[in-house]
Structure formats: C-alpha cells, structure tokens
Amino acid sequence: MQDSVFRIESEYVPRGDQPEAITQLSDNIRAGVAHQVLLGVTGSGKTFTMAHTIERCQRPALILAPNKTLAAQLYNEFRALFPHNAVEYFVSYYDYYQPEAYVPTSDTYIEKDSSINDNIDKLRHAATHALLTRRDVIIIASVSCIYGLGSPEYYAKMVIPVEAGQHMSMDSLIGRLVDVQYERNDYDFHRGTFRVRGDVLEVIPAYHHERALRLEFFGDEIDSIKEIDPLTGNVLGDVGKTVIYPASHYVSDRDNLNRAVSDIREELRLRLEEYRQGNRLVEAQRLEQRTMLDLEMIEEMGYCTGIENYSRHLDGRTAGEPPACLLDYFPDNFILFVDESHITVSQVGAMYKGDRSRKQTLVDFGFRLPSALDNRPLEFSEFEKRLNQVVYVSATPSRWELDRSEGIVVEQIIRPTGLLDPLTEVRPTKGQMEDLMTECRSRTARDERVLVTTLTKRMAEDLTEYLTSMGVSARYLHSDIDTMERMAIIQALRRKEFDVLVGINLLREGLDIPEVSLVAILDADKEGFLRSTGSLIQTFGRAARNVDGRVIMYADSVTRSMTAAMQETERRREKQRLYNEEHGIEPVSVRKSLETPFDTLYSDARSAAAKGRGKGRGRQAAPAQTAAEDTTAYGISAEELGGLIQRLEREMRESARDLEFEKAAELRDRIRMLRERLLQQD
C-alpha cells in the first residue's frame, strides 16, 4: 500500500474567506465532527477550499457530484491541483442505458440495451485500483457510487502478482488471466485483452489504455517484465514486479462460483415450486429457461450477460443485505464532500425506490429470480451507515443539510477575485426576444458569452433555432445529450466556437464558465422547482465569475422567490463591496485554462459538437439542422407527417442493416416523437 502525501501544486494561495473556511473545516474534521456545511457563494472557490482541507487533513476523499458534467469539471480541477496524487473519476459507464423491464398491461418485455463508454470503464477500474493500492486517493463520483459493484474482498483476492524470476508457466498465467475475465486476442489488442507470441505474453490491464505489460518467459519462469506502448511496442521501462487486477469488478474464484451456482439452483427450485403450485406455468417455464442458460454460461465461462443480477449469491450475502459499492472500497477514515448538496442528497435518496419498482415486476412475472432485487443501489439509511465524516457543499443548502449539521455552517461569501454577486434586474416579457437579441449582440461584440435558461427542452431547442436564424451563434444543452458531448459543448462555448448557450436546469449548479457575463432567465415568474429561490440564486451564480456579470429576468410580475433571491444577492453584494473597500481590492474576472486533463475523453464529442451532431441517442446537440427539421413537422399535414415517418423508418432499417446502430436508434426515437405528434393532430 503506497502512503504518499497529499500535496497541492498551485500558483494561487487561499484568499478572501477561504483561509478561515479551510481552518474551520479542518479543525472540525480533526475534532470528529460528523456533519458540517460549507455555505459558499458561486465563484468563491469552494473546490479550492475542499482541496486545501484534504491536504491539511491528509485523508482519502470522495467528492460526490450531482451529475456527470459537474463530476468531469471537478475531476479536471482536482487533477490540476493534485498532479502527484491519485485523482480518479467514477461515474456510470453507460453512454446509453435501457434497463430490462416488463410491462404487464401490454405483455411487453424490454430487453436490456446499453452502450458502454470504454474510457469511463477504464477510469472506474483505475479508481478501484487506486483505492486498493494507495492512500493518497481522491475519487470524483456521481450517484453511481451507491450502486452494486462487486465485493472488494473478492476483487482484491483475485489479483495476479507477477515478478521477474518468479516460477510460473505461461499456461498457468493464461489460465489465471482468463479466470479474472481477460480475453485472449492476438489481433485486436486493447484494454482487458492479452496476446501471446512465442515465449512472450503481453497484456493491457483493465485500468490502462496507453500502457501494456510484456512478460517474457524462459521455460516455466518469468524472465523479465517490461512496460510497453501497446501501439508501437516500444519499451517504456523495466518492471521488477507488479500486480494485474481483474478485468471486471464481478469476479470470483472457482470454489465460490460453484457455491454460488448451487445456491442459484436451490433458489430456482423453490421459485419454480411456488409458480407451479399457483398454476403459473408460463412464468415457471420462462424463469427456468433463462436461469439455466445463465448457469451454463457461469459454469463454462465464469460469467454471463447480466451476472450482476446474481451478485447476492456471488458475494455470499443474505436476502435483503445491501450490495458492496464504491464506498466499501474506501478506508474507514475517508471524508465525503457532497457537492451541490441541496440536489445531490435527494438524488441519493431517490435511487432505491425507482430501481425496486422496475425489478419487482421482472421478479413477479418470471423474468428474474427474487435475488435480483438485491442487485440494487443503497437505501439512504444504508448510505449513511457507510459514511465517516461529511461536508455538505452548496451555495443554497437545504433544510435537511442544515438540520443534519446541527448548525455547524462554515460561510464563504468573499471571493478571492474580489468579484461581487452579479447585478440583477427584471424586464417585461413584451418584446423580450428583441431585447435578448440586443443583449446577446452587445456581449458577443465584447468577446463575452451568454447563458439563457428556459423551462422545457422544446423551448430550449426552439429558441436556439430562432437565435441561429437571426445570425446569433447558439447551441442548446439538456439531458438528452450524452455526458461527453455536454462537456464538449461547454468547452466549445469557452473557446468561442459559439456565443450563446441555451439550457434548462443543466445551467444551474456548478458550471464554471468565466467568459459568461450575462444570464438571461425566461419565464422567471413561473413559480416552481426551476424558479424557486434556491434555483434562481444558483442560476444567478453562473454570471458571478465575470467582473461584468449581470442577470436579466424576463417576467410580468415579481414572485416571492424572485424577491427573496434578489434580496439575498444584494445582501451578499453589500458584504463583498465593503470587504473590497476595506482591503483595497479591485475585482477581476476569473481566469481558467481551456485545456484540461479530460480533453482526451471527449475529443470525439467535441468534433461532433462543432458539427452540431451528437454521438448519443435521441435529439442531440444538432440545434440548427435537427431542431429545424423536427420543428417543421408541427406545421405540416397529417398525410405529409405520415410520409416523413415512412421515410425515416426506411432509413432506420437501412442503418440497422449496415450495423449503424446508434444512427438507427436516433432515427427510432425521432419516429416515436413524430408518431406522438401525428396522434395529437388526429
């Protein structure tokens, strides 16, 4: 176990409220305080404060973010601050995920369909590898960290230590690699595979892309181990000894597999008896056929498709016992920082019930054994039991966090840059489009950027089309766009590939775009989740990293939420102004590098974003072409709409025949949407 020291490398030092906040947080952690709140305004450097707290306490940390976009941003920042420590990224590796489901009313079974991002899968393996091999670890994670992952005990038990001079035959090593789910591939050499050439075996570990291991044998002895470039074969260095970690988190030794198979067979026997006694013969046949096929695969290969549904048996857990997850890989003294806690905490609490409802139907109708219910995210109470010390980080903490921390709130109002909270004003909705166009052109003339928030995806897409048609370079951002492309779009905005970004709630929490000087909020007087006091304050904050930051709310009335948000913003502005006057500080805009360590992960997505086309499913960031094409469908007759659907269906079938499944899936989703419009017209 490597015991390195957390060490920040930065040209900046804590300023404003940061030094006091770092001291208070660190002292509370050392004193054993279990829960505390860091209430920091947008742009006050909460990430920098978290980093210095970690450095001062010298403990492993988990940073829990509300979505992949913010997790990626935090990953960039912590990697830059801790270049010599293990900063890793752990989010869902699905670019697209359609869970297995059954709809009893229509007798429709929906098979699991997914697309795994290989880069993110590698980063997940790198995260667990780091946790098991060193102590200077910071993991940036989404709510994916509470989902079942496979037992850390079995994962660590199945590692393969290798050393130059070790007595081990090549056949023995090949067998062990296959046991931990590496695949032999002598032609397509990639992560998680190995190849053999004479007395040389080369393997790319699951947590690497750019480096491979070359093991040279002399008889039944490992003669040498070298690190090589998998593409060129060039030797990068000699390795005296190393450890090869499994290619999957769901691994187990043969004895445990045999025990698990026996347990699964017994559960199947009992379940079949129950179905047959109730004369549910269809369910019995379905369950027996599916389960026996899975068991055959497990016995022959050591795994099967959907093996996670048998994780309770593989882990040796009892019914109802929670699964192992990323939290179980951490040492007991780790610190949890819940970023944007006002939304992240509720996310954690919501995961279990949604998952349970879907799987219960599968179990009831014979698609899965009851043990599949234990392949699940943690319940909130189980999540809390796994925590040691927690810091809730938010500009607008909810009542739950404030109560949980029992009044231990560390405030961070003064920004290191001297920036004040943005000026806010309310303008009438009459003529708002013309006014917005004028403001956008004014900002772009000064090489600044604009964020516009709407209430719905359709409004975001239509507004983007309108702005584009009027000569304003604009794109939209919402939840239909996959993770990597979201990051690419944000980077493209910063690089001035376009000037105006239109979105919904994705533009609220945490997005760090210092080039933005104007945030325009449409329908600001529509009370609700997206226009609550907390949401408005968060949205205001997107303009708080620029010295010329301003917020314009378009509304015909001023709601209580608007009033409260403006009053709180003015209170903070006054406190910040007085501090600047007292210390002779001149506000300056935040400066942030455009290049990030995460660039390699979304370079393809950036290319797609620049073209206005996405790699993911459904309607992506293709605002000018796709949105325009779909929008015109509203104005055509039912007959023409039917013709358009038929044309798209032909394209979908052709794409499927050509194995262009992503394109086929995108066309399928557009066809569904057009059919809904056709029904509305009827």
Swiss-Prot record:
Q: Predominant location of this chain?
A: cytoplasm
Signal peptide residues are none
**Gene Ontology MF annotations:** ATP binding; ATP hydrolysis activity; DNA binding; excinuclease ABC activity
Q: Provide GO CC annotations from the record.
A: cytoplasm; excinuclease repair complex
One Pfam annotation reads: UVR
Q: What residue intervals hold the motif Beta-hairpin?
A: 93-116
Q: Which segments carry the region annotation Disordered?
A: 609-628
Family named by the database record: Belongs to the UvrB family.
What protein am I looking at?
A: UvrABC system protein B
Whose protein is this, by species?
A: Oleidesulfovibrio alaskensis (strain ATCC BAA-1058 / DSM 17464 / G20) (Desulfovibrio alaskensis)
Q: Which gene encodes it?
A: uvrB
